[in-house]
Amino acid sequence: MTDTFWAFIGLILFLALLFYFKVPAMALRSLDERAKRIAGELDEALRLREEAQGILAEYQQKCAGIEQDVQEIITAAKHEAEIIVAEARVKTEEYVKNRNKLVEQKIAQAESDAIQEISSSAVNLAISSASKIINNELGAKKANDLIKESIIKVKTNLH
C-alpha cells in the first residue's frame, strides 16, 4: 500500500463525509439563494432605473415648459417696455407742445402789452403835445375845455 492509495482513500472518505452532511445540497441552496438575491437586486435596479428615467423625462418636460414660460415672459416684458417707451415719447411730445404753446402765449401777451403801452405812451405824448400847442395858440380856458373834450373822445375810441 502506497501513499497514493492512502491519499485516494482519504479523498473518498472526505467526499463521503461531505455527502453524509449534505454539504453539496447546502452549497447549491446557498448558491440558489444568492442567485435569487442577485436577481432581486437586478430587478430592483431595473425598476429604479425605469423610475429614474420617468422622473428625468418629467423634469425635462417641466424644464421645456419653464423655458417656454420664460420666453413668453420675456416677450411680454419687451412688449410692455415698448408700450411704455411709446407712451413716454407721446407724453414728452405733448409736454413740449404745451410748453411751446405756453411760451407763444406769453410772447403774444408781452407783444400785446408792449403795443398797448406804446399806444398809451403815444396817446399821452400826442395829448400833451396838442395841449401845449393849444395853450400857446388859444386862450387857457378855451384850451382846457377843448383838451377835456378831446381826452374823452380819445378814451372812448381806444377803449
Swiss-Prot record:
It is a single-pass membrane protein. CDD domains: ATP-synt_Fo_b. The keyword Transferase does not apply. Pfam families: ATP-synt_B (PF00430). The keyword rRNA-binding does not apply. It is found in: Cell inner membrane. Keywords: ATP synthesis, Cell inner membrane, Cell membrane, CF(0), Hydrogen ion transport, Ion transport, Membrane, Transmembrane, Transmembrane helix, Transport. GO terms for molecular function: proton-transporting ATP synthase activity, rotational mechanism; proton-transporting ATPase activity, rotational mechanism. The chain crosses the membrane at residues 5-25. One of its GO terms (cellular component) is proton-transporting ATP synthase complex. It comes from the Bacteria. NCBIfam families: PRK09173.1. Belongs to the ATPase B chain family. F-type ATPases have 2 components, F(1) - the catalytic core - and F(0) - the membrane proton channel. F(1) has five subunits: alpha(3), beta(3), gamma(1), delta(1), epsilon(1). F(0) has three main subunits: a(1), b(2) and c(10-14). The alpha and beta chains form an alternating ring which encloses part of the gamma chain. F(1) is attached to F(0) by a central stalk formed by the gamma and epsilon chains, while a peripheral stalk is formed by the delta and b chains. F(1)F(0) ATP synthase produces ATP from ADP in the presence of a proton or sodium gradient. F-type ATPases consist of two structural domains, F(1) containing the extramembraneous catalytic core and F(0) containing the membrane proton channel, linked together by a central stalk and a peripheral stalk. During catalysis, ATP synthesis in the catalytic domain of F(1) is coupled via a rotary mechanism of the central stalk subunits to proton translocation. Component of the F(0) channel, it forms part of the peripheral stalk, linking F(1) to F(0). This is ATP synthase subunit b 1. The lineage of its organism: Bacteria, Pseudomonadati, Pseudomonadota, Alphaproteobacteria, Hyphomicrobiales. The gene is atpF1.
